Regions:
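Catalytic Tyr-X3-Lys loop
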Residues: 138, 146-165, 198, 222
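A short, exposed helix-loop element centered on a Lys and neighboring polar residues
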Residues: 168-169, 227
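The beta1-alpha1 cofactor-binding region of Rossmann-like NAD(H)/NADP(H)-dependent oxidoreductases
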Residues: 80, 109-121, 150
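Catalytic loop of short-chain dehydrogenase/reductase
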Residues: 176, 180-221, 226-234, 244-246, ...
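Conserved glycine-rich cofactor-binding loop
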Residues: 51-55
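Conserved mid-core segment of classical short-chain dehydrogenase/reductases
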Residues: 120, 124, 139-154, 173, ...
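Conserved glycine-rich Rossmann-like NAD(P)H-binding loop of the short-chain dehydrogenase/reductase
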Residues: 69-85
Length: 333
């Protein structure tokens, strides 16, 4: 099966918007580093990361552990990879945890994220969780629709969207069962317990690369799905995160060769950004929205008023009046 070259792509594609921030990041930096600004930021958190055997998921697991998470749940279809990541976490955190943080509990669970029963067993075994990162993904070969393999097309949709749905559904049900959204504390402390869901989106969700008729629309679905969680679940901090252009095994196998030179971002970039989203109240104005790990977080926070007032970073049809609730009518941050 031949990969579709860019030269065959249509030329009249939608125009791109100007960059949201001027500082574009490609690797970990102090503001999102668990060794610097985010040291101990994840203390007390229990985190489940799907697709955590390699690539971005592996980096996210290590970053949360280094930031002080009390429990990391690793899951994918490959036990060997997960065991290796568990060993890495234990070695990386040994002698680097405060007495308050204690040891990081690392659980390994092999699961089929497209099987509801398997997902239910996963979340039962995981126990109480504070953060879910839906990182598992798949990428179909870049070919025109007429030449596509239906099984590859469906597999991409199943893993990227259906798997995200099943994991999020199980996470939300477990969260509600333990009182998430209800008032915590006594007396004047009316804070409500919140949890966080980070869904893996893509810059491709806002673009049209002929040949990726499932992956890119599927990531647009992830953006919209994230919005639904946001508007349905006030106590859930949810984000659709583009992890950057990372040369993962999937990208190497399925992305056209002419794109490989642009895949220069480090998986640690997305990992640090995910820790920042999950632990920083400065990120609250981004709840429900698409966000890119390439965007410098300090510049992003400086754009808060502009993003909120102009209602940016939602997925919509330009020119069509909005039928979803306006963000400021639902949650004010």
């Amino acid at each position: 099966m031949l990969l579709l070259p860019l030269a065959n792509a249509a030329t009249n594609l939608p125009k791109s918007a100007p960059p949201l921030v001027s500082a574009v990041r490609h690797d970990m930096y102090d503001a999102i580093s668990p060794a610097h600004a985010l040291a101990h930021a994840a203390q007390g958190l229990a985190v489940l990361i799907t697709g955590s055997g390699r690539g971005v998921g592996r980096a996210e697991a290590l970053a949360f552990a280094q930031a002080g998470a009390k429990k990391i749940v690793l899951t994918s279809r490959s036990r060997d990879e997960l065991d290796e990541v568990k060993k890495e976490i234990e070695e990386a955190t040994r002698d680097h945890r405060t007495p308050e943080e204690g040891e990081c509990e690392v659980l390994v669970h092999v699961a089929d994220l497209c099987d509801p029963a398997s997902v239910d067993v996963l979340f039962e075994a995981a126990g109480e969780l504070d953060v879910l990162i839906n990182n598992a993904g798949y990428l179909e070969p870049c070919v025109p629709i007429r030449d596509s393999d239906p099984s590859e097309w469906k597999r991409t949709l199943d893993i990227n969207h259906y798997g995200t749905y099943l994991a999020t559904r199980a996470f939300l049900r477990a969260a509600h069962a333990r009182g998430v959204g209800e008032e915590q504390g006594v007396g004047g402390d009316n804070a409500k317990k919140e949890v966080t869901v980070i869904n893996t989106s893509s810059i491709g969700s806002a673009g049209t690369r002929p040949g990726f008729s499932c992956y890119q629309p599927g990531k647009s679905m992830i953006n919209r799905f994230t919005e639904f969680v946001h508007f349905e679940e006030p106590a859930v901090r949810t984000f659709a995160l583009h992890p950057g252009g990372v040369m993962t095994k999937l990208a190497r196998d399925s992305m056209p060769p002419d794109t490989h030179d642009s895949l220069t971002d480090k998986p640690e970039l997305a990992a640090g950004f995910a820790v920042w989203l999950a632990t920083s109240r400065k990120a609250d104005f981004l709840r429900g929205r698409y966000v890119s790990a390439n965007w410098d977080v300090d510049q992003l926070v400086a754009k808060r008023d502009e993003i909120v007032q102009m209602d940016l970073l939602w997925t919509r049809v330009v020119g069509q009046e909005q039928v979803m609730p306006h963000s400021t009518h639902v949650h004010l941050y």
